[in-house]
Amino acid sequence: MTLRVGHVITSGVFSLDGEDFDVDNNIWLVGDDREVVVIDAAHDHRPIVEAVAGRRVLGVLCTHGHNDHINAAAELAEAVEAPIWLHPDDGMLWDVVYPDRRVDDSLRDGASIAVGGEDLTILHTPGHSPGGCCIHVPSLGLVFSGDTLFNGGPGATGRSFSSHDVLVGSIRSRLFVLPDETVVHTGHGDSTTIGREARNLDGLTDGVDRDPGSPDAAS
C-alpha cells in the first residue's frame, strides 16, 4: 500500500525560560491503511486519535523535547498503545514535562523506521535543541523538519540549550543536501521546499536569534 500523510493542527502554549507563548502546532501522520507513525503529539491527543482511525501506531516520534511538541505524547501513547521515541540529548527537556515517565526508545541519527513497507530515516539536526531531529521519507520526497527549518528560515535559537551556529550547520549539512524539490513539512506554519529555503541564504547567516513568539519563528 502507498504511504500517505495526514495532518492535524492543535493549539496550546509553549513554555520555556519562564515565558509562555501561544502556538499552533502541526502534527503529522505517515502510514498506510494498516499502520502509521505520529510525528509530534502536541497539546491534545484526541484529534490525533481520530486521525489515526484505528490503525496500528508503530510509534509516537518526537522531533525534539520542547513541551509544545510532547505534551500530548503520553496520553496518545496510552490511548493507542504505542511507544514514544525521542533523541536522548533532549532528555532534560522531556523530564520537565514528564518527570515520572521515561521515553520508550531513542531516535538515533541514521536509524530507519519502517512503516507501510517504506523506510523513514532519522536525521539528527541539533541547534534548536540538542536532540532535535528531522525525519526524511525518501519514497515520498519529503522531510518533517520539526522546528529545525521553517518556511522562511531556521527555527528560533534564543532560548536555553539552543545555538544559532549549530542549527545553521545542521541545516546546511543534513537538509540542504537533499534534492531541491524535497517538500519540508514543518512543526509550525506552512510547508516549504528544500530548494526554496536553500536559496534564502541570508536568512541562515544573519546571526539573529528569532523569538518563538514572533510571527516569523516558532518554538
What do the predicted segments below correspond to?
Residues 2-55, 134-146:
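Conserved beta-strand hairpin/beta-sheet module of binuclear metal-dependent hydrolase folds
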Residues 7-29, 95-98, 102, 153, ...:
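Active-site-proximal loop/helix segment associated with metal-binding centers of metalloenzymes
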Residues 22-23, 36, 43-119, 199-207:
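Active-site HxH/HxHxD metal-binding segment of metal-dependent hydrolases
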Residues 26-28, 105, 110-111, 133, ...:
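Residue-level detector of beta-strand structural context in well-folded domains
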